[in-house]
């Protein structure tokens, strides 16, 4: 059997002959790692920045990406942005979150800095995302036990022993009253 081209929204397609009269077709779709809003539509993109789906219903567990102006959001075409460097960092953050099996509700780009929102915690990653920074999240989030605030990973390095966490003011007042 010959090979043809695969549609951009598919990761892999395999066709097998099961018997002389039947075939098995297996299709693996590209998984979205984030989405942006385009009016009332949710525009989902994969780890390469390719728009893999557009719809009016949100998919649970995929983070909203805010703060980047995108020129075009056409289905099966790459997202184009003037801020390609920071967009690359956002894609990297999405990939690393997926590897760590973490779900961020939102990824925000503000003044060339990246922020993740995981539950009640805002994680400040700075201008560059590294796998080491994201790898710190699971144990830290477990220790925070639902506290609200900002976790500062923008200056994190492997030889750093402490990572600053600013408790949200309302949470701090409640704990002082008790």
Question: How would you name each of these model-derived features?
Answer:
Residues 21-23, 42, 51, 114-115, ...:
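Hydrophobic residues embedded in beta-strands of well-ordered beta-sheets
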Residues 5-11, 92-103, 142-147:
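Short secondary-structure junctions
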Residues 8, 18-22, 38-42, 46-47, ...:
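Extracytoplasmic
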Residues 3-31, 50:
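Membrane-embedded segments
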Residues 17, 25-31, 66-69, 118-120, ...:
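Flexible glycine-/small-residue-rich
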Residues 80-138:
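Soluble extracytoplasmic domains of inner/organellar membrane proteins
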Residues 121-178:
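Extracytoplasmic/luminal low-complexity segments enriched in Pro/Gly and acidic/polar residues
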Residues 25-106:
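Extracytoplasmic segments of membrane-associated envelope/inner-membrane machinery
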């Amino acid at each position: 059997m010959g090979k043809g081209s695969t549609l951009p929204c598919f990761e892999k397609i395999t066709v097998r002959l099961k018997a002389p009269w039947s075939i098995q077709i297996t299709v693996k779709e590209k998984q979205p790692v984030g989405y942006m809003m385009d009016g009332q539509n949710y525009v989902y993109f994969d780890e390469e920045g390719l728009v893999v789906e557009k719809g009016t219903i949100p998919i649970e567990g995929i983070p909203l990406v805010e703060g980047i102006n995108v020129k075009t959001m056409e289905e099966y075409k790459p997202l184009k942005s003037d801020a390609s460097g920071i967009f690359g960092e956002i894609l990297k953050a999405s990939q690393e979150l997926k590897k760590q099996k973490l779900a961020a509700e939102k990824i925000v780009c503000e003044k060339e800095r990246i922020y993740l929102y995981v539950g009640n915690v805002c994680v400040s990653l700075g201008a560059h995302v590294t796998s080491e920074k994201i790898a710190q999240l699971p144990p830290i989030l477990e220790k925070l036990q639902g506290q609200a605030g900002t976790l500062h990973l923008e200056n994190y390095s492997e030889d750093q022993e402490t990572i600053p966490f600013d408790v949200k003011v309302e949470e701090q007042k409640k704990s002082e009253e008790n």
